[in-house]
A protein has these predicted regions:
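Ligand-binding "clamshell"
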Residues: 275, 291-322, 405, 417-431
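Cytoplasmic-entry segments and transmembrane alpha-helices of multi-pass inner-membrane transporters
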Residues: 4, 8-12, 27-59, 75, ...
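Bilobed "Venus flytrap"/periplasmic-binding protein-like clamshell domains
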Residues: 226-256, 261, 326-398, 481-484
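Non-cytoplasmic
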Residues: 75, 128-179
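C-terminal transmembrane helix and the adjacent membrane-cytosol boundary/short C-terminal tail
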Residues: 35, 92, 169-222
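A bilobed periplasmic-binding-protein/Venus flytrap-type ligand-binding module shared by bacterial periplasmic
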Residues: 330-341, 436-450
């Protein structure tokens, strides 16, 4: 966790707060002055509040692409409810005598509302702003899922590796931010109530938000550089992307910028898009086939490798796979070492006699009906009949394994957490799971512009065995070493960087 991430989080919160104020105040005033528009406006802002945060961000991202703008607009929509409702309510509660006096002085309705009623209503309006800002601090955590940055990525990673100290630290920072901002706004609110809505004082807190936003602008800029890529939400992706940066910047004059965290699917969508917000990513030929292209391993012609088939399919996307890196990260089946010792488990087939005593666990994706690399085809292929099968969030899977929530789990072969929680990875003795080989996926236009990049990155081809990648991720996820430190040390060991 770094100060940059904290300031990024604050930037997102303040930007969304300013935008929600700019949109919410006029909507609230409109709802007050128009009895016809009022129920429509209030129902719309109520409806927006009921949409799950991730779903809303996903919808916006389809239109705007990943990044901070998607998050800011999403939080803005979420923040409208308290601002719009409190604005309308505050104006309704202004003393009728004051309204009548202003009317009697010949003031026009717009002038009365803006210059007389609104200043008196502002303490109530500001309560809505205060609620919106504090709520935005928590909602901004979801920025990590759409490449928006902030502290959400830290929390997600900490949950995945069961790092309670990091979870508490990141949560503590969010709580401190929320408490400090709430105390400051509470003080301003008290001052405004004492001044009975002085028109000058009411803009002081808004001006303070604007000033803080301006100071944080450097943390809201998008990626700039010759080559852009996103940080991953797994240490494996982070390690490989940092190796890209180190090698390219060491051997050329190009600048590589690693942007905010991004999931594999969203990274793919950004990579193939014409927005040029991403130039390359690490992935796996099998993942490209099944997850990105929406095909299945049975679609690969007999005698052709997944790698070669995928490359033919990628031509229409303007993308190229570089040479295979040596490691594969396919699905694997893991069991606690104690269970393996008790029953002498070495292969997946060894589970057949005891499957009816065991609970199977995997992320929800493994239980979907589409595709051959899923639960139903797997148990039918091996003749397994588990006592129960449960789904769990990918980030919580290893915690569930440690807690004994299930006995058999789907894992990834290079995940360093397998070693941490004491899982024995069983041999896929009947070869159900195909190898998913690690490859760099690069835009063709980048290779046309900088052809040397392919040669530089292909220096890693075949140099990272699966066991080596598992050890590298273990050093990051379990031993707590930084991604930069582990990546640099490995490149030095290969002779690709100087010590």
């Amino acid at each position: 966790m770094s100060w940059d991430l904290i300031f990024q989080h604050l930037f997102i919160v303040l930007a969304a707060s300013l935008l929600s104020i700019a949109v919410g105040l006029p909507l609230g005033i409109w709802a007050y002055v128009s009895k016809t528009a009022r129920p429509v406006i209030l129902r719309i802002v109520d409806l927006l509040q009921t949409i799950p945060s991730l779903a809303l961000l996903g919808i916006i991202m389809v239109v705007l692409d990943p990044g901070k703008l998607t998050v800011i607009i999403g939080i803005t929509l979420y923040s409208l409810l308290p601002i719009v409702r409190n604005t309308c309510l505050g104006l309704q509660e202004v003393d009728p005598g004051v309204k009548e006096a202003a009317r009697g002085m010949g003031m026009s309705k717009p002038y009365r509302v803006l210059m007389v009623e609104f200043p008196l209503a502002f303490p109530t309006v500001f309560t809505g702003i205060r609620i919106a800002v504090v709520n935005a601090i928590g909602t901004a955590v979801f920025a990590a899922f759409v490449g928006g940055g902030g502290l959400g990525g830290v929390i997600t990673q900490a949950i995945r590796i069961s790092d309670m100290s990091l979870i508490l630290a990141a949560t503590g920072v969010l709580m401190v931010i929320a408490v400090v901002l709430d105390l400051i706004m509470s003080w301003f609110e008290g001052q405004m109530r004492k001044s009975r809505g002085g028109s000058k004082k009411m803009w002081i807190p808004v001006a303070a938000i604007v000033l803080a936003f301006i100071l944080l602008l450097p943390y809201g800029r998008g990626g700039t550089g010759d080559i852009l890529l996103y940080d991953g939400d797994y240490s494996e992706t982070q390690l490989m992307h940092h190796m890209v940066k180190m090698l390219v910047e060491d051997q050329t004059d190009l600048t590589v910028t690693i942007q905010d965290q991004m999931s594999q699917v969203n990274n793919w969508n950004s990579l193939k898009d014409d927005s040029h917000t991403c130039d390359l990513m690490i992935s796996y030929d099998g993942t490209i086939l099944t997850t990105f292209l929406g095909q299945d391993t049975v679609d690969v012609p007999e005698g052709m490798t997944i790698y070669d088939y995928v490359q033919g399919e990628l031509d229409s996307y303007g993308l190229t796979q570089l040479e295979q890196l040596g490691f594969e990260n396919t699905y694997a089946i893991g069991v606690p070492q104690a269970l393996a010792d008790e029953y002498g488990l070495e292969t997946i087939s060894d589970l057949i006699p005891i499957a009816d005593q065991l609970t199977f666990g995997a992320e929800q994706e493994f239980f979907t009906l589409e595709g051959s690399m899923k639960y139903d085809p797997f148990v039918k292929f091996y003749g397994l009949n588990f006592q129960d099968a449960v789904s769990v969030d990918m980030g919580l899977k290893y915690s569930a394994i440690e807690n004994g929530s299930f006995d058999v789990a789907v894992v990834y072969s290079t995940d360093g957490l397998n070693k941490k929680v004491g899982l024995k990875v069983l041999e896929d003795d009947q070869s159900f799971f195909p190898d998913y080989n690690g490859v760099f996926l690069v835009r063709d236009d980048l290779l046309e512009k900088y052809p040397e990049v392919a040669d530089i990155l292909n220096q890693l081809a075949g140099k990272i065995p699966t066991e080596q990648m598992a050890e590298l991720t273990y050093q990051v996820d379990v031993e707590g070493r930084t991604v930069d430190e582990v990546a640099r040390e490995f490149l030095v060991s290969l002779g690709l960087l100087e010590a």
